[in-house]
Amino acid sequence: GSCTASLTGSAVVTVTNDPTSTISANTICSGQTGTLTFTGTPGAEVLFTDGVSNFTVTLDASGNATFTTVALTADTTYTLISATTVTPPATASLTASATVVVVGLPTATISGTTSICSGSTTTISFSGTAGAVVTYTINAGANQTITLDASGNATLTTPALTADTTYALVSVALGSCSQNQTGSALVTILPLPTASISGTTTICSGTTTTISFSGTANATVTYTVDSGAPQTIVLDAAGNATLTTPILTAPSTYALVSVASMSVPVCTST
């Protein structure tokens, strides 16, 4: 005959999902570090590369992780390679990527070094990154700002200056990116020339006398005789000049009109 026995038992096949991860990156200013953000299977070890070196991060219990890059000066792409879990043991190939976008730092320069006559104005020019805000000082005073236009230029007209004045760059900023800047423009002030006249006297009709001028060395003095046409005389290196009048038979007035320096630019006083 045949024998029959009843049996019991089972086999359980557990199917687990492959580990996963996503990657994202931020935008930074040149010279800063970037931040990569990973999200995926809790506990997974994520392998990724920048095309030169490989790196790993482990996702926390919430499935998140961040990674700080080295300081970057150019856009850099990071690509996922794989995600691996220990329990259960599994590895999945990944291909997603994210790029840390690097924004170049703004720049600025300053120009306008010149010499002007005391009491005059001049123009200081700035150039650099379009739209940037340039911070500068005047004679190391409080910070002031000027914004570059769409062409990357800006100018300012100084007030009337009577002493040497230095306009110096401090920094430049555009959005969240900024850096210190160096450079300056020196406005040198040339003193106004001076002149005086002497020689008031009484003489006998038909005689001559001497008129004396003094003032800034080498300056050109303009004067009139009895309100006539302007005439000039040049002071010597000691700042002096004299002239002998013609024979006079009536009172005569010698009057100063102006004095001009030999400097560049020429400075004039009246």
What are the roles of these predicted feature ranges?
Residues 2-7, 29, 86-95, 117, ...:
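Short, exposed coil/turn segments at beta-strand boundaries within extracellular/luminal domains
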Residues 59-78, 147-167, 234-254:
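Solvent-exposed segments in extracellular or luminal domains encompassing
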Residues 11-17, 98-104, 185-191:
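Interdomain boundary/hinge segments at the C-termini of tandem beta-sandwich modules
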Residues 17-25, 104-112, 191-199:
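Proline-enriched interdomain boundary motifs that mark the N-terminal boundary
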Residues 32-39, 121-127, 208-214:
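A short beta-strand segment in extracellular, disulfide-stabilized domains
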Residues 26-32, 114-120, 201-207:
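Short, solvent-exposed loop/linker segments at the N-terminal edge
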Residues 82-83, 171-172, 258-259:
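Conserved structural position at the C-terminal beta-strand
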Residues 42-47, 130-136, 217-223:
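Solvent-exposed loop segments of extracellular immunoglobulin-like
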